[in-house]
Amino acid sequence: TNERHKHCELGFGQGVSLNIHAASSFGLFFGTDFNPAHAAHANVLAEQNQVPHHFYDASFEELLNKDLPMFDSISLHGIWSWISHENQHIILQFIRKFLSPNGIVYISYNCLTGWAANMPVRELFHSHFKFNSTSTNPLQKVNDSLNFSEELLTQNPLFAQRNPNALNKVQDLKKQNPNYLIHEYLNQDWQCFSFQQVVRILEEIKLTYAGSTDLNSHLDN
């Protein structure tokens, strides 16, 4: 068919991967990122590559109310676990409204199975960052919170005795870029989901699980 497939990415960040796809395929790409600087960067890349594009700095609710085509695919990477229940509901409405029959949704999220052991560490880190650090500098607050968490766990409380990797996790976090940690761990909204939870949520809007996009998981060796 000569008809162009249409794709939409919710929360495209700097828009790099979105532009790569737009430049290397016959599809027509739409997307939004609430950060105006991110959206501006994505649009500059698209204009430099001379690819048709529709990139916005709209909220999910604003995008829901736009006059948009039906999409063959809708993607959200690094979004679902870091937004409010209200925004999750809006995204479900968006998918139900704009996904073509037989369309595909790609969704990534923090999986409970992998995160369960580190959730108390994140809660300790986040609580000190939000309530106890005396600094007004976010990067210093990250360092203060990690130092506090490390000092607490080195006292070998019962939690650390039962979860010996907790201290190692904090020490690993201290090696990370503080800006990354703010985004990854310190959002106001932060949730983990089991696989079955996500399946049930998406079944409510008539989606059926198709498979993992990690190609390695489909190989025997």
Language model: regions and residue ranges:
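Conserved SAM-binding loop of SAM-dependent methyltransferases across substrates and taxa
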Residues: Q14-F26
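Conserved SAM-binding loop
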Residues: A42-N43
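Conserved SAM-binding strand-loop segment of SAM-dependent methyltransferases
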Residues: Q50-F60
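A short glycine-rich, Lys/Arg-flanked "PGG" loop and its adjoining helix->strand segment in the class I
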Residues: H89-P101
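Conserved SAM-binding motif I beta-strand of class I
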Residues: L28-D33
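Rossmann-like AdoMet/SAM-dependent catalytic core
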Residues: P157-N221
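Conserved class I S-adenosyl-L-methionine
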Residues: I107-T136, K141-L158
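A short acidic, Gly/Pro-enriched loop at the edge of an enzyme's catalytic core
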Residues: N65-I74
